Curated annotation (Swiss-Prot):
Pfam families: YbaB_DNA_bd. GO terms for molecular function: DNA binding. InterPro entries: YbaB-like_sf, YbaB/EbfC. Belongs to the YbaB/EbfC family. Disulfide bonds: none annotated. It comes from the Bacteria. This is Nucleoid-associated protein NIS_0256. Gene3D superfamilies: Nucleoid-associated protein YbaB-like domain. The keyword Magnesium does not apply. Homodimer. Binds to DNA and alters its conformation. May be involved in regulation of gene expression, nucleoid organization and DNA protection. Keywords: Cytoplasm, DNA-binding. Coiled coil: none annotated.
Length: 103
């Protein structure tokens, strides 16, 4: 993989990787993800950093604490999973063969 590169080229590759990583992080931070549970009775929104930024709860759940807790946990887990899967997809897309001089 690196046999046709000199150290100067390798430095450029690492610089490009850093630039792509920074751009990826900026793009990730601007994204938002929404998960619903209970047929939409609970809606949880997270940003691309995995921070919960909004929770909407239907009034009908306010009297049923057990259901509220179960549905809230489910929606939070779902939205965090969405964020993690997106991060992994983005990281893999950053590592294209052309970055190492391969085509």
């Amino acid at each position: 993989m690196f046999d046709k590169m000199n150290l100067g080229d390798l430095g450029k590759v690492f610089e490009e990787i850093q630039e792509r990583a920074k751009k990826l992080q900026e793009e990730q931070e601007s994204k938002s993800f929404i998960a619903k549970s209970g047929g939409g009775l609970i809606k949880v929104t997270a940003n691309g950093k995995g921070e919960i930024i909004d929770i909407e709860i239907d009034d009908s759940l306010l009297e049923d604490k057990d259901s509220l807790q179960i549905l809230l946990i489910s929606a939070i887990n779902d939205v965090l999973k969405m964020v993690e899967e997106d991060k992994q997809r983005s990281a893999l897309s950053m590592m294209t063969p052309d970055i190492f001089g391969q085509k």
